[in-house]
Amino acid sequence: MLVAKVIVPVPLDKTFDYIVGEKRAEVGSFVKVQFGKRSYTGLILELRNLTEESEYKLKEIADVLELEKIDTKTLQFLQWVSEYNIIPIGMVFKYLLPIGLLDSSSREIKTFKYSNDKVDNLTQKQKQLLDFFKENKDYYFSENDIKKNLNIGSSVVKTLLKYGLLEEKSEKVSSIDYNFNVNNVNLNTLTDEQNSVLNQINSHVDSNEKTILLQGETGSGKTEIYFHLIYNYLKNDNDNQTLFLIPEIALTSQLIDRFNKQFNSSIAIWHSDISNSKKRDIWLGVLNGNIKVVIGARSALFLPFKKLSLIIVDEEHDSSYKQVDNGCYNARDMAVLRAKINNIPIILGSATPSLESIINTENGKYKKVELKNRFGKAILPTIDIVDLKKEKNTILSKFLIEKMKEHLGNKNQVLLFLNRRGYSPIALCKECGHKFLCKNCSCALTNHKSKNKLICHQCGYSIDLINYCPSCNSKDSVIFYGVGVEKVEEEVKKIFPEKHIAIITSDTMLNINLMKSTLHDIEEKNIDIIIGTQIITKGYHFPDLTLVGVLDADAGLFGGQFKAIEYTYQSLTQVIGRAGRGEKVGEAVLQTYSPENIIIQALKNNDKCMILEFDKQNRELMEVPPFGKMAVLIVSHDKEYDLIKKIKEILRVFPVDSNLEILGPTQTIPYKLNNNFRYKIIVKTKNNINIQKLIKTVLEKVNLNSVKIKIDINPYNIP
């Protein structure tokens, strides 16, 4: 009797046996199976002949889907992702095939827009949704946008529609032609330096050195090299496919325009915001080999490529490649793994490479090529440092204001960078010290003045802004500490009332169309001043942007994270690099309370080596990645007593070993999230220890049914 080991998309780290019967099934085939009371699409991992009768009554595969089968290399990749990150194989399968994707056949998507607010007695969620539409009344949003940004379901949308508060529009979703014609390509000519780097990459690949770090200054033209590589691989074999990973999908609009212009063809874009029917088209096109190029966020790494020949990871240092929900993994590292399994080249590009990648070039695992000059006549911005200790509690220093006047007077654009969002981070009572905290989490609520609300940035809980203290009843006693984006906007409007301002944060850029519209306004010079947070550091090119002001250069330096030095240097280098990318000369102003700090000085002097050595010494001393292995176990439960009891049980199982260090348990930040208490255990080992095997062995000895546990191998941040 032929039996198939089938991966089922459930959060269990095991496969399930099904009888094949008379059906034609192969390893890698997609199949329909009954699991419990539900029907799922599964994936055959292995076939074997069962000679003896099973102690369980096996079910038969219901159907074998008429789809291309997954190759053995992709199956091996899924297994390695599961084992390395300690993620159940069923969850990893859902990365490859999200549940319900193949059921999506609709060619129509409904979007909604604000109509009016002439109805009283709305519920809190109905009012929240209506406020959202009112604040963005010029834009249509899909149910997917609403769910993603507000966690509000379709029933609330339908109620507002029934009341006549929203207007509805149906859009046909066309099946885009992704045909790629290598004879219809019009690539830009490379500079001598770019051409030299391209030749170096090809030489390394010919020598079977296929993992390559491309370090290039901001604005040096790394993307042009990517395009030439893509063209070469597609030209060499019509069946070849390439994957271009980017950290933020908001980056795609400029990148897609450049690609379409040079390749004269549409490109498949993969990210969470596209409709299920479009995802289905792309997924099937990748599986059958019709789609040749995919640009996407980290989830695109799990697409079922038929013949993947090249992977490019742009901004390889970016923390957005790290997934921290529904299984933790680093898409950059998993991309390197997939390239290794497929024996194909992978290019890791960045102006500010991660320390891990630099160490890998030093020990010979990766090869490194460099672009040292900006493209064309562009030069790196000059940098001035302002000591905020000499200023009078102002958001914008006198020096920065004068620089803004100078650049705006020359009809150029200014970017103000803030490492926060919201209006002011903390609301409290000046009389009794009461802090306004989220009822679900242990987080301080953030003041969003434009919405007149205090909002939790963890779970989305909000309350109306009040002028009295609910603890001591003092009136007009609520004060706010800290500076946020809205506060900066308020200050800028006072000084430059006639200038047009755009705010680019993860809060304001609610979907890709809104981001595209804002970027278009900037490119058309309808915007004078951009105020942004981390999202604005990512690879944007604005030729008329000549001044960058960093309002809080110290932010992130003293937060206790072991990667704080690297993160701060990377984000500031990237945002400074937005200035002067065209023919105009750029300037940057760093406002700081620590002007003598080694990172601030290294930025001013463009001294990468100083930062690198300083960071290496610190991490080597602490024995943290890449000079040791680390994992964080976050254990949670809605009852704190039961949680602590279970954590003690876990700790007792860890062996005593000189190569092993256990830190904790300690409360996470935030300590309470979505009504669950959370503690963390940090596991540190020498590099020669198999940390995954150690953790799995420990957890197998403990009954974890009563608690939730999240495992993060090589964490980016420790909560």
Tell where the protein language model's regions lie, with residue ranges.
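Arginine-glycine-biased low-complexity disordered regions
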Residues: 636-647, 664-691, 712
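Short secondary-structure junctions
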Residues: 496-499, 654-662, 702-707
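Accessory, non-ATPase domains that flank or precede helicase/AAA+ motor cores in DNA-metabolism machines
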Residues: 1-350, 362-378, 657, 674, ...
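Short, amphipathic alpha-helical segments that act as regulatory/interfacial helices
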Residues: 79-82, 130, 134, 161, ...
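Solvent-exposed beta-strand sheet faces enriched in polar/charged residues
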Residues: 169, 417, 448, 591, ...
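Inter-lobe coupling/hinge segments of SF2-like helicase ATPases
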Residues: 185-191, 208-644, 680-681, 689, ...
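Short, flexible, solvent-exposed loop/turn segments with mixed acidic/basic and small polar residues
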Residues: 7, 620-625, 668-674
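Short amphipathic alpha-helix segments
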Residues: 608-612, 642-663
